[in-house]
C-alpha cells in the first residue's frame, strides 16, 4: 500500500475511534467503556503490538531480551512472567506499573520482578493490570510495542487466562516453541486459538543448541506438518535458534556467537516484514478490533431489549444512535476498500463475513447464558433482578469477547 493510501485509511480508522467513547457512554457499561478506551488508545498511538506467545519456559523473555540487547526482563528456571508487559521505544528507561484500579506507579528497573513475576507477585496478589517499559532499543520501528506474556500450561492457571485474553489484541505474533519437547497438545490448542485471531505468525523453535543439526531438521519437519494441519496454511516458515546464545553474544559483542545462534535469519525476516507489510496488517487488525467492539455493543443492546432492563424509549434511542454509527462505519469502509489493492479487498471482505458470523454466534451464546442464569434471580424483586442481570450480562459479553 502506498504511503498516501495508508495515511488516508489510518485517518478514517482514527475517525471511527473518536466515536467509540460516545457509543460506549450511551450503552452505559463500565466493561464496554474500558474496552473502547483500550482500543482508542492503541489506535491513537499508532501502536503495533508484536506479541511473544508460547508455553511456559520456552524462552520468550530471553528472546525479547535479545531484541532489546539487554538483560531487562527477568528470566529463570521457574515460570516467571505473571502479567502482560509492554515494551515501547523511549530515549530513556522508564517502568510504569498500571494496576487494575487504573492507578499508575513508576518504579525503578531493579524492582520489575516484584510486580511481573510469580516470585515477586504470586498469583498477581498486587492486582497489576499491565507493566509498560520505555527502553532505547533499536531492533524495531519506534511505533512497534513488544509484548511479553505469561507462559501457558503451567500450574498457574491465572497466567494462562491472562495470555489467552490478550490474543485478540495482537497485530502480529512470535510463537515460541523449543526442542524439549517440540510441540505439545497444549501448544496445539493454543495455536488454534491464535490462528483464528491473528494473520501474521512467526514460528521460532528455541534452544536449538541443545540438540544436533540432524535432530533439529527432524524437529522442524515434524513441527511444520503439525502447524500446517492446525493453521490450514501451506507456507510455514520456522526459525530454529538459541535465544540464550544470541543474547550472550549480543551483550558480550561476540559476533561469532550471534551467528552460531542462528537468530539473524529470524531477525532479518522480522525486520523485512515490519518494513514492507506492517501497515497492511495493522489496518486489518484495527478494523477487526472495531468490528469486535461493535459486535459486543450489538449483543449488549439486543439482550437489553430482550430483557427490558432499560426503559424502552432509552433502548430505542441507543439502538438508533448505534445504527447511525454503524452506517457511518460502513460508508467509510467502502472508501477504504477503494484504496486497497484487489487482493486486500478480498481479505477485508472475508473479515466482514467472518465478523458477521461471529456477531450472530455471540448473540446466540449470550442469550443462552442469560436464559440459563435467569431462574437464579427469578424470585427477586424487579429492581434487584435488573441489577443482577446487568452485572451478569456485562460479565458474559466480556468473557465471550475475550
UniProtKB/Swiss-Prot annotation:
Xref: SUPFAM superfamilies: P-loop containing nucleoside triphosphate hydrolases
InterPro entries: Dynamin_N, P-loop_NTPase, TRAFAC_Dynamin-like_GTPase
Naturally occurring in which organism (per UniProt): Caldicellulosiruptor sp. (strain Rt8B.4)
Family as reported in the entry's similarity comment: To M.genitalium MG148.
PANTHER family per record: SARCALUMENIN (PTHR43681:SF1), TRANSMEMBRANE GTPASE FZO (PTHR43681)
Pfam families referenced in this protein's UniProt entry, alphabetically: Dynamin_N
Domain of life from the UniProt record: Bacteria
Protein name: Uncharacterized protein in xynA 3'region
